């Protein structure tokens, strides 16, 4: 008799995706982050569902409902902080996942890569809307500033902003619709993730060497299930340490003050995982220019396959490209720091130089260095 996992229509899909999936034998721990993102997504959906049971999307009660969750609901504080810090873990995994894709040339799987970019946009939008829900000072002013960026769009900008707000300012209508979208988006993200995996399994996984691995594949289970489980444990320990010892470490103290449209915080800034984008936005003194730079800083990922001039797929054997890659990482960390600083000298100048360097490395230096490496290898 055939094994049920190989004959049952539903089990067969799971079997081909997670059990008997032929996987390159040499993929490193950098490949763990895809499965970690899946776990983060499940964790966010579960904790978010329980939070939604007690949260009220109304400007008069939103802030106090979050306080009620922390004080009166059984383990409400735990659910709330796992959700808030889970978002941070989500973005750490997301950025490492994208970084690994750039380093090892995974962007050459065009469909998977483009689907991943759509997922990145979706997760960013969801996180932004979630940050507005506690209705603290930073929630309110963050929503006001970021949605206001759309007013930079010529001709339709102002109408578009008022349409999103549902009025002439961020108010009850805005909060209600943000809650509705924040609730539905994770399920859309789950569906997009299935498509992302579908495209990936059409081609099979890339590997650190960047060369075809069809001659050397091993089953996903038990080799990579046990390896992924090790990754889960690491992330779980870090998340729990954060939640139980310093749950507000990555948050903003201003968000413990109820939203007040008449009082602007001295320094409006988004969550830490958006700070480098925010620094790029601020580095251009023109509103439309800043918005364009912000959008292009993410959209630039789409043209990654077109900028690939090397004869080798991976950076594993390309030391000059490796140096550039780590320069890019250091530059993004600098931008993250700049985004958290006030708009004054020398932060403005450092931000402008770092923003310029970000685009220069990706658009000019990486393709040029790849061509130089080809020449050095007489290819």
Swiss-Prot record:
Q: Which residues bind heme b b566?
A: 97, 196
Q: Briefly, what is this protein's role?
A: Component of the ubiquinol-cytochrome c reductase complex (complex III or cytochrome b-c1 complex) that is part of the mitochondrial respiratory chain. The b-c1 complex mediates electron transfer from ubiquinol to cytochrome c. Contributes to the generation of a proton gradient across the mitochondrial membrane that is then used for ATP synthesis.
Cellular component annotations (GO), alphabetically ordered: mitochondrial inner membrane; respiratory chain complex III
SUPFAM superfamilies according to UniProt: a domain/subunit of cytochrome bc1 complex (Ubiquinol-cytochrome c reductase), Transmembrane di-heme cytochromes
Q: Where are the transmembrane segments?
A: 33-53, 77-98, 113-133, 178-198, 226-246, 288-308, 320-340, 347-367
Family of this protein: Belongs to the cytochrome b family.
Q: Required co-factor?
A: heme b
Instruction: Please give the name of this protein.
Output: Cytochrome b
- Residues binding heme b b562 are 83, 182
Q: Where in the cell is it found?
A: Mitochondrion inner membrane
Gene symbol here is MT-CYB
Q: Record the organism.
A: Fukomys darlingi
Sequence positions that bind a ubiquinone: 201
Q: Which InterPro entries match?
A: Cyt_b/b6_C (IPR005798), Cyt_b/b6_C_sf (IPR036150), Cyt_b/b6_N (IPR005797), Cytb/b6-like_sf (IPR027387), Cytochrome_b (IPR030689), Cytochrome_b_C_euk/bac (IPR048260), Cytochrome_b_N_euk/bac (IPR048259), Di-haem_cyt_TM (IPR016174)
According to its UniProt entry, the protein's GO biological process terms are: mitochondrial electron transport, ubiquinol to cytochrome c
Q: One Pfam family, short name please?
A: Cytochrom_B_C
């Amino acid at each position: 008799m055939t094994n049920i996992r190989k004959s049952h229509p539903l089990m067969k899909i799971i079997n081909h995706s997670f059990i008997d999936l032929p996987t390159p034998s040499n993929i490193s721990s950098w490949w763990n982050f895809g499965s970690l993102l899946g776990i983060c997504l499940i964790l966010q959906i579960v904790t978010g569902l329980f939070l939604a049971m007690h949260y009220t999307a109304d400007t008069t009660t939103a802030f106090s409902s979050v306080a009620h969750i922390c004080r009166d609901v059984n383990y409400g504080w735990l659910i709330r902080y796992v959700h808030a810090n889970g978002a941070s873990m989500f973005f750490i995994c997301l950025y490492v996942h994208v970084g690994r894709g750039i380093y090892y040339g995974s962007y050459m799987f065009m469909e998977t890569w483009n689907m991943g970019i759509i997922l990145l946009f979706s997760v960013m939008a969801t996180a932004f809307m979630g940050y507005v829900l506690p209705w603290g000072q930073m929630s309110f002013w963050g929503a006001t500033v970021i949605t206001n960026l759309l007013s930079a769009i010529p001709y339709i900008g102002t109408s578009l902003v008022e349409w999103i707000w549902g009025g002439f300012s961020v108010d009850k209508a805005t909060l209600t619709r943000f809650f509705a979208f924040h609730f539905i988006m994770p399920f859309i993200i789950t569906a997009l993730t299935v498509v992302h995996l579908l495209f990936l399994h059409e081609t099979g996984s890339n590997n650190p060497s960047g060369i075809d691995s069809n001659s050397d594949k091993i089953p996903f289970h038990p080799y990579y299930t046990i390896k992924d489980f090790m990754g889960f444990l690491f992330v779980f320990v870090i998340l729990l340490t954060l939640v139980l010892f310093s749950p507000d470490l990555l948050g903003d103290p201003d968000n413990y003050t109820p939203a007040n449209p008449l009082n602007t915080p001295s320094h409006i800034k988004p969550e830490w995982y958006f700070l480098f984008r925010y620094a790029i936005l601020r580095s251009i003194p023109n509103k439309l220019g800043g918005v364009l730079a912000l959008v292009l800083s993410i959209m630039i990922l789409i043209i990654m396959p077109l900028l690939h001039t090397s004869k080798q797929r991976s950076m594993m054997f390309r030391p000059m490209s490796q140096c550039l890659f780590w320069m890019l990482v250091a530059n993004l960390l600098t931008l993250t720091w700049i985004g958290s600083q006030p708009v004054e000298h020398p932060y403005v100048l450092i931000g402008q130089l770092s923003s310029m360097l970000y685009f220069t490395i990706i658009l000019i230096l990486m393709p040029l260095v790849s061509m130089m490496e080809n020449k050095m290898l007489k290819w």
